[in-house]
Amino acid sequence: MEWEIVIGLETHVQLATESKIFSGSSTRFGAAPNTQANEVDLALPGSLPVMNRGAAERAILFGLAIGAKIAPRSVFARKNYFYPDLPKGYQISQYELPVVVGGTLSFFVGEEEKTINLTRAHLEEDAGKSLHDEFHLANGAPASGIDLNRAGTPLLEIVTEPEMRSAAEAVAYARALHGLVVWLGICDGNMQEGSFRCDANVSVRPRGQVEFGTRAEIKNVNSFRFLERAIQYEVRRQIELIEDGGKVVQETRLYDAERDETRSMRSKEDAHDYRYFPDPDLPTLVIGQDWVEAVRATMPELPSAMRARFEADFGLPAYDAAQLTISRKLAAYFEAVARALPAGQAKLAANWIMGEVTATLNREEKDIADTPVQAAQLAALINRIIDGTISNKIARDVFAAMWAGENGGEPDAIIEARGLKQISDTGTISAMIDEVLAANPAIVAEYRAGKEKAFNSLVGQIMKAARGKANPQQVNDLLKAKLSA
């Protein structure tokens, strides 16, 4: 039987505010346990929540960026459940009237563009954190501790429709969403610190079946690699279970990265299990059109708009434009390089940034903001390729030297110091070709007998004689002319 995978994602995005969503406590990460929790976070009797305007504005900004409807009236609700790190015995969230409704997000899976519909995005408070490894009782027995520093940190929970059909598609969506919230400045995107956490709802069904299968939710996956592996494992588990005559149980599961498997955590609740009702301590959040427009005025150029501009202004393919707008810093870096080159050479800049620059950043686990090669320096290097001073191959060696800080990272100084200027003098190259042809009559005969590979062998020997500095195009042209004579 052929199976179809159905995936929907719920992503918890910690909003980059200085204080918590309903209290004045700091949201700074890494403080000593329970030093950033006041009476509201601790749910002490008589304490009342006060809405953080900045959290609402960040939610509005996100809604505008995805083309969603901003609800003119939004209500906070109590989501009732017990957990040790939830002091109130309920979480303040949103249910029937979220702040953001609908919207879409487009992204690339390989070179294929996809668009996913979003159901909603709602504001809520984060819970505290249970710590299980650091504590022991006086008799040595294991114990757990509770850190409430995170309790009350503002979250935007972003929910998709169940429209993704592969783990690769889910990861591509998650990367695009991560890029967007960081681009907008509403989240720092630090997955190791829990700023961006994904829950994946996964089910399978026979291909062609309309009804959804029973889903399992995989909780709090904090890396893109783990998200892909968790979904892949869960899909295999469900298919094997069904094909062996079993039934998938609706439940919440955790991904164990060390064992590369998901395991059951608890039965999956439905909405009615949480007994949602409007929070009587918080008034309705009223969002007037003037407030929406004020937030819209702060919006940066969006990735989608910048992609379209890069395609129109620089003639880039859609895939290149998408890759170069993964982050604002990368997009700004590319644009600075492209505008420092002659007209029509932006594609060369794109190739270098998506190739050599990105590969080096990945190898050294750095962000584009940390590159030692500035945009002006990369543009100067590419200009030396364009004007024929060096070949593309030699340019890669120069780039490595620039990255290492040689000669201040200036390409012209490195080229001069290393004597790397390309040989473009026709007479000099012609003499080298004559020497190679005279020394290799057998290879010349093979080429003239129709063996095309012999040509590449001759080119290789000429470039070796020139120590890689001969202009490759001139070598090809002159060699072909001499062999045809």
UniProtKB/Swiss-Prot annotation:
One term of GO molecular function: glutaminyl-tRNA synthase (glutamine-hydrolyzing) activity
SMART domains in the record: GatB_Yqey (SM00845)
EC number(s) stated in the UniProt entry for this protein: 6.3.5.-
Superkingdom field: Bacteria
InterPro entries: Asn/Gln-tRNA_amidoTrfase_suB/E, Asn/Gln-tRNA_Trfase_suB/E_cat, Asn/Gln_amidotransferase, Asn/Gln_tRNA_amidoTrase-B-like, GatB, GatB_C_1, GatB_Yqey_C_2, Gln-tRNA_amidoTrfase_suB_CS
Reported function: Allows the formation of correctly charged Asn-tRNA(Asn) or Gln-tRNA(Gln) through the transamidation of misacylated Asp-tRNA(Asn) or Glu-tRNA(Gln) in organisms which lack either or both of asparaginyl-tRNA or glutaminyl-tRNA synthetases. The reaction takes place in the presence of glutamine and ATP through an activated phospho-Asp-tRNA(Asn) or phospho-Glu-tRNA(Gln).
Recorded family membership: Belongs to the GatB/GatE family. GatB subfamily.
Protein name: Aspartyl/glutamyl-tRNA(Asn/Gln) amidotransferase subunit B
Organism field: Bordetella avium (strain 197N)
Name of the gene: gatB
